[in-house]
Amino acid sequence: EDMPKLIAIDLQPMAPIEGITTIQGDMTSMAKVEEILAHFTDGRKADLVISDGAPDVTGLHDMDEFMQAQLILAGLTVCTHILADGGTYVAKIFRGKDCALLYSQLKLFFKQVTCAKPKSSRNSSIEAFVVCQEYSPPEGFEPDDLSRVLHERAKGMLQEDAHGNALGTMGWPT
């Protein structure tokens, strides 16, 4: 009982590792999320969730950054169900010119959100890790509210031009 619960999920098959539950599949799939959650029905919570998943890159940086952000939010979905108060979430991120919305959304749930780039990573690489510490969801938050809460944060960050047209966080028309 005192042993940590370790669960790994990957699209590719994994060799079995003693003491680790492995799940093959896509963590953006609701069926796989439910499979992960089934391992936490005993009331225990995770202290740490790590995601180093990345989409197949297209070479279109804006698209790659968007797809990576969706993986981070899929991980956040899992966190809202299983992460203990004060817990940590670490995820691979593609640092782009406009990460403000994603950081803002993560800061709704974590007291500290920082970006860390390992020294071993090439300087030219946009790959880094977002480190989210001290999980503390908004008061009254229920995991099923996640989409609504993230959407409201996104709406709050949108600006309007002089004609009332919505502008993205970079000031471009949406």
For each feature predicted by the language model, list its residue ranges.
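Mobile active-site "lid"/loop adjacent to the S-adenosyl-L-methionine
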Residues: F40-V90, F94-Q105, F109
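Short, ordered loop/turn segments at secondary-structure junctions
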Residues: L11-Q12, M27, G53-A54, T88, ...
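S-adenosyl-L-methionine
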Residues: D2-V57
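Conserved S-adenosyl-L-methionine
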Residues: F110-R122
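Aromatic/acidic cage segments in peptide-binding pockets
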Residues: P4, D26-M27, E65, A69-Q70, ...
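Eukaryote-biased feature marking scaffold/signaling PDZ-domain proteins and nuclear chromatin regulators
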Residues: P4, I17, A31, R44, ...
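Intrinsically disordered, low-complexity regions enriched in proline, serine, glycine
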Residues: I17-G19, E34, A91-I93, L101-Y103, ...
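SAM/dcSAM-binding transferase cores
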Residues: A128-T174
